[in-house]
Structure formats: C-alpha cells, structure tokens
C-alpha cells in the first residue's frame, strides 16, 4: 500500500485532514476514527495516524472529494473543544509504525526494597510528580548531569533497537562494507567496519593535519574579494533569526509541499538512545557543514555540495561521534573548514559557526528543514545516498521528537563557546603575520619605486 501525501490543521473545534489521492472512486473510501487514531483506506492508498489528542467520529464528522485537486478533505470534531493539538506539522511523528514491537526492558533496572503498605499507597502519587530540571543551567560539558533522566522523560514512545558501530546512535554496521570502496570520496576511514570510535577520532585529527595547506590558507587570507562577498551574503535562516531577535517574527515555520512530502516518506523509526548527549552534540557538525556550503554557494547548491557537507561533517566523513564537549566539536568544525574546502578562511569559519547557532536557536522546525535539505542532496547522488540510511534519515525523524529545552541549551552554548587560533594546533597567526609583512614590504617597495 502507498502512503499518500497529507496535511493536517486545526481550529478550536475541529481537526482537518487533507489526503491527496488522485484518480479514485470516492464511494470506495473507508475512513474511521477512534480516540486518537485515524484510518484512511482506498486502494492503493493507506494512511494510519496517531494524533496528539482524541477526536470523535460522530455526525459532525464529514468528508468530501475534490476531483480537480485530487484531495479528500476530512473533518473530525475534537473530543475536547479548545484543546490545542501540538506538532501537527511534524508529519512523520503522526504516522503509526506498522511494525511496532513491545518495548523491551533495559538489561539493568533500578530496584527498591519491598515497599511498606504506606509506601504502596503513595506510590501512584509519587509517580505522577513531575521531575523538575533546571533547563537554564543545564550544561553539555557537565559530567554530573543525568542524561538518562532526559531519556526517560522524553522518549516514552521509543523502543529498543540494537546498536553496533557507526552512524546515528552508533547503530549501523555493514552498510559501508562495499560503498566505502567504490567512488566514495567522502569516507576517510580506511576500514569503517573494523575501526572503533576512538581510532576514528585519531584518524580524523591525523588526516586534518596532513591536509592543512599553509599556502592555501595564506592565499585566502590575502585575497579577500570572494571571501567578503560570501561573508556579506544573508541566508534565509539568518534573515529569520534577525527578525526573531527584533521581535518581528513568531518563529512559525510553514513547510513547503516538497518538505511535507519528504516528511510523509521518512521511515518511522523506534530507538533506545544509549547516549542522548552524544546524539545532540553530533547534530552540530551536520548543521555547521550545511551552513558552510549554503554560505559559500550563496544559497544555490552545486554538484560539489554533497562532498562539501559530507567532508566538513566529521559525523559523516569520519563517522566520528566520539565528542564529549561542544568545544571539541567547535575545534573539529573549524579545522575541517580550514583544511578541505575551496575557501579556507578564519573569519568565514567563525561566521559559519554563528550561522550554526542561528539555525539551532530557531528550533526543531528550522533544524528539520536544514536536515531535509541535506537529505535531498544526498538522496540524488549515486554513491553518497548511503549516508541518508546511516545518518540523515534518523536525524530527520529524531529531531521531530527532540527536547526543545535541550536544543535551546545547545544553541546557547554554541553561541558562548570560543576558541583561539592556537587551539587548532596550526600556526595560523604566524601565517597571517607573514602575509602582513609581505604586504607591508610590497607597499614600501612600490612607494620607493614611485619616488
């Protein structure tokens, strides 16, 4: 069966579902709803949704078919008028997983002493108490923060999945066994199926050191014309970010029809996130890599965009998820942007880091839009499409369920993080000083000739 394109919206009393099913016989459509589940079926289409609130299938519910547009327009009354159903635009999260498995218990559980009768009477009340987290002071570099608590709070719908070697949540293996050997110019790990995470980090740093070219960096430091044009470019997310800062935007983002179609087609996954902190942190290199490519192409992706994004993102090129702090990621992003792409400039790298902060601060919908853009680029490449299966499909689904407070904390700490040129372990200041001396000497020579 085919999952059709669909959209959802709401008002105070009703939920509206529009399903695109052209060339059908409307009389054969089967529609029903019970509590928060909605079913739509007409060969060859099937749609099963799980709404964030309950609806009623009573006399007020109705459906009509627009032959010209091919849409079935369905209306269900809300069980509780005035209730706001959140995230109706995050379509992937509404699709019911047809292959659900029972949630498996963790291998290790916390157990308590046998409760007394008085304890048992108060157990249900204690369980209902909301766990309080000081979101303002959460810090990604704090070794004492209980990331397992965040997992228990946010991932009630997620189920157990075995993990292995690389990719999102370190849960994939075997996918790069042959792909890495056939025209994959992004992959930088010689044996991705056999290389442990710590070794991947070491290989990444070593390759960056070997790739850094002082003359290339010197040339981009001296010749600023194209660099300045790139720095003055304003991407769409920066425009939106500036409006938000000025209080002129409410952050509401409406997905395009292409984005909605991509969301509906995303494979719905179930996860047990072993290391939530790591999943949030490894999102940053992806966003940075996109920000660099988007800025240097002035918003018009090229045939090199896949390579740019994949190579700049250590999450993809080196399968490196072995980061413990935001500063480690900052240094890795800056180093890669100064070692691999066409434009290698310190100011450009820092600007792309600021772009990363802007995207993260706009929230999960803008992050999702960026991930869908990256995913679309990789989807149409003969070799690099594999990274959708390893990284991008999962991130595009997971971000729809990510914790807004943690994303805000991540964005804040990205903005607060600073590094020096010395922390790249490359002689950037020395190179720049040599360029300045050369310029001064050249100017003095020109003046003496004129005299």
Swiss-Prot record:
Disulfide bonds: none annotated. InterPro entries: CS_dom (IPR007052), HSP20-like_chaperone (IPR008978), Shq1 (IPR039742), SHQ1-like_CS (IPR048696), Shq1_C (IPR007009). GO terms for molecular function: unfolded protein binding. GO terms for biological process: box H/ACA snoRNP assembly; rRNA processing. Residues 106-128 are annotated as: Disordered. One of its GO terms (cellular component) is cytosol. It is found in: Nucleus. Keywords: Nucleus. Residues 1-89 form the CS domain. CDD domains: p23_like. It holds the Pfam family SHQ1-like_CS. Transmembrane segments: none annotated. Belongs to the SHQ1 family. Involved in the early biogenesis steps of box H/ACA snoRNP assembly. This is Protein shq1. The lineage of its organism: Eukaryota, Fungi, Dikarya, Ascomycota, Taphrinomycotina. The gene is shq1.
């Amino acid at each position: 069966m085919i999952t059709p394109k669909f959209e959802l919206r709401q008002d105070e009393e009703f939920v509206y579902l529009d399903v695109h099913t052209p060339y059908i016989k409307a009389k054969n459509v089967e529609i029903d709803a019970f509590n928060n589940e909605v079913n739509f079926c007409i060969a060859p289409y099937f749609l099963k949704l799980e709404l964030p609130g309950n609806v009623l299938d009573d006399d007020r519910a109705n459906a009509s078919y627009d032959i010209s547009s091919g849409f079935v327009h369905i209306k269900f009354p809300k069980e509780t008028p005035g209730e706001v159903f959140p995230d109706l635009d995050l379509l992937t999260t509404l699709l019911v997983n047809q292959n659900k498995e029972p949630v498996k218990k963790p291998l290790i559980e916390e157990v308590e002493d046998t409760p007394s009768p008085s304890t048992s009477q108060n157990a249900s009340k204690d369980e209902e108490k909301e766990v309080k987290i000081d979101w303002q002071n959460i810090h990604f570099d704090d070794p004492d923060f209980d990331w397992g608590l965040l997992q228990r709070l946010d991932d009630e719908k997620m189920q157990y999945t075995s993990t292995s070697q690389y990719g999102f949540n370190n849960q994939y293996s075997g996918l790069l066994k042959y792909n890495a050997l056939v025209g994959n110019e992004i992959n930088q790990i010689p044996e991705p199926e056999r290389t442990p995470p710590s070794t991947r980090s070491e290989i990444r740093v070593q390759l960056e050191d070997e790739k850094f070219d002082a003359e290339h960096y010197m040339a981009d430091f001296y010749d600023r014309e194209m660099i300045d044009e790139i720095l003055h470019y304003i991407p769409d997310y920066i425009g939106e970010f500036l409006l938000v800062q000025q209080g002129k935007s409410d952050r509401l983002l409406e997905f395009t029809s292409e984005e909605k179609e991509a969301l509906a087609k995303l494979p719905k996954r179930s996860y047990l996130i072993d290391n939530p902190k790591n999943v949030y942190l490894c999102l940053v290199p992806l966003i940075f890599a996109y920000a660099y490519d988007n800025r240097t192409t002035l918003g018009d992706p090229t045939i090199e965009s896949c390579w740019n994004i994949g190579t700049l993102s250590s999450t993809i090129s080196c399968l490196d998820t072995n980061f413990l702090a935001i500063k480690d990621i900052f240094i890795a992003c800056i180093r890669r942007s100064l070692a691999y792409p066409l434009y290698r400039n310190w100011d450009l790298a820092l600007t792309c880091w600021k772009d990363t902060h802007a995207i993260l601060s706009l929230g999960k919908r803008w992050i999702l839009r960026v991930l869908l853009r990256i995913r679309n680029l990789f989807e149409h490449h003969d070799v690099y499409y594999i990274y959708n299966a390893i990284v991008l499909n999962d991130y595009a689904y997971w971000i729809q369920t990510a914790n807004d407070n943690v994303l805000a904390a991540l964005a804040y700490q990205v903005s607060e993080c600073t590094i020096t040129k010395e922390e790249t372990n490359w002689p950037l200041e020395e190179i720049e000083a040599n360029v300045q001396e050369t310029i001064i000497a050249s100017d003095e020579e020109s003046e003496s000739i004129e005299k």
